[in-house]
């Protein structure tokens, strides 16, 4: 099963809103909407793992951290993100990090 972290992104929220509208107008069933979301989870995780090759460095002050159910959560303050030609400063960042390897069954889906 793929992580559902990306459902709370702009793309994921837009997809969920569109699916909700289709359910309300009875154009699709809730079960079909769930299948679409599950496919989105798999596709976005695979695309990010295979296609994104940019590198960004960041530095900040660690406020809190937590490790629960194989998921790390970090909250950083006064963070600087550096790319090759760009520097972005933000007051607070929450990072959620999950194991990128498939820890489930060995079946291919």
Curated annotation (Swiss-Prot):
Coiled-coil region(s): none
Gene3D superfamilies: Transcription factor IIA (TFIIA), beta-barrel domain, Transcription factor IIA gamma subunit, alpha-helical domain
Keywords, in A-Z order: Host-virus interaction, Nucleus, Transcription, Transcription regulation
Localization per Swiss-Prot or TrEMBL: Nucleus
Top-level taxon of origin: Eukaryota
A GO cellular component annotation in the UniProt record: cytosol
Assembly notes: TFIIA is a heterodimer of the large unprocessed subunit 1 and a small subunit gamma. It was originally believed to be a heterotrimer of an alpha (p35), a beta (p19) and a gamma subunit (p12). Interacts with NCOA6 general coactivator. TFIIA forms a complex with TBP. Interacts with HSF1 (via transactivation domain).
Record function comment: TFIIA is a component of the transcription machinery of RNA polymerase II and plays an important role in transcriptional activation. TFIIA in a complex with TBP mediates transcriptional activity.
Protein name: Transcription initiation factor IIA subunit 2
Organism of derivation: Homo sapiens
């Amino acid at each position: 099963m793929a992580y559902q972290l990306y459902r709370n992104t702009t793309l994921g929220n837009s997809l969920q809103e569109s699916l909700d509208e289709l359910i309300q107008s009875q154009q699709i069933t809730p079960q079909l909407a769930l299948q679409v979301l599950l496919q989105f989870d798999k596709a976005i995780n695979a695309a990010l793992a295979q296609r994104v090759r940019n590198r960004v460095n960041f530095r900040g002050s660690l406020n809190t951290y937590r490790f629960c159910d194989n998921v790390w959560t970090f909250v950083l303050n006064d963070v600087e993100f550096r790319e090759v030609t760009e520097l972005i400063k933000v007051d607070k960042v929450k990072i959620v990090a999950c194991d990128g390897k498939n820890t489930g069954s060995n079946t291919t889906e």
